[in-house]
Amino acid sequence: MEKRMELLPGVTLTAVQTEKFKTGCFSINFFRPLRREEAAMNALIPSVLLRGSEGCPDLRAIAARLDELYGASAGTLIRKKGEVQMTGFYADFIEDALAGEPVFAPMMDFLGELLLRPRLENGAFLAEYVESEKRNLANAIASRVNDKRTYATGQLVKTMCAGAAYAVPRLGELEDVEPITPEGLYAQYRKVLAESRVELFYMGRKSAEDVAEQLRRVLRELPRAAAFDAVGTEKQRAGGDVRRVEERMDVTQGKLSMGFTTGCTAGEAEYPALLVLNTVFGGGITSKLFTKVREELSLCYYAMSSIEKNKGVMIVSSGVE
C-alpha cells in the first residue's frame, strides 16, 4: 500500500508498506534547480556530511554505529532528472521484527544527525573533510572520459543543449570544484536545507503513519524558508542547423552519438506514441537499429536509442570500429 503525505512545508513522504522483504529502505532527496554555479557544491555536500557528525565524528565511528544497527548501510545520492539536481542519502536496514528490537527509529535518528548536526570547525565544515571529498569529486569528474560511451553522450548533451541548464553535468564541472571553501560549502548547505523541496521515500513493514511520526520528530529542526526554489525542466526546442562535433582519441572503437529533439515530454498526449516509436527505432533487440544496422549490415558494434522524457530529446548511441 502506497501513501503520500506532507510532513513539513515542502517536505513530502512516499511510504510503501509491504511484508515482502526482510530489510527496509529509506531515502531523502533535496531537489535543486540544475545550475552550474552550485552543481559541484550540491554534489559535494552529501559526501562531506557522511564523513562525520557531532556524535560520530569520523568514518570509524560511523561504521561502528552502522554495525550496531545490525550491519545497516548508508550512502549518498546524486542524480539528475531533466533540469533538476537531486542530492541526499539512502539507507538499508533490517526490519524491527527480525532484529527483535527497534532498528528503524535509531536508524532515522542516525540519518537525522548526519544531516542536521554535521561536524563543524569555526562555524564551517571541517576543512580536512572538505578537501578530501573535493579530491574524490574531482577524480570522479575527471574519470568520466574513461567511459567513452557515457562521455560521448555527455559531450553530445553539452553541444545540443548549450546554454540550457540541462547541459550541466550531474556532478558539476571540474573547474568549479577547486574554488570551493569550507565556509562557502557550509553556506550552500544551509541554503539547500532551507530552500529546497524535499522528497522522502520509505519501503518496509511499518505503516505510513508510524514512519511519518518518526520523521516529524527527527526532522523537527530542519529549517524551512517561506518559499522554495522552483524546479522544473524546459522542453528542448529545435536548434536549426545540424551541429557536428568531433574529438579525436587513441581508441580501438569510435563512439557516434546523435541527438534529436522530439517536441514531446512525459505527460503529453503524444508521449505513449513516442515510446512505441523509440522501441521500434532503437529501444531493444527487435528494433531497426539492432536488427538492420548492427545485425544485418554489421555497421557497428552496438546501436541503440533512448528518450529523455523530461527534456524532449532522443539520443542515439553507437560504437563503430
Question: What positions do the PLM features span?
Answer:
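Flexible, glycine/proline-enriched loop segments at strand-loop-helix junctions
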Residues: 121-125, 140-143, 171-177, 201-202
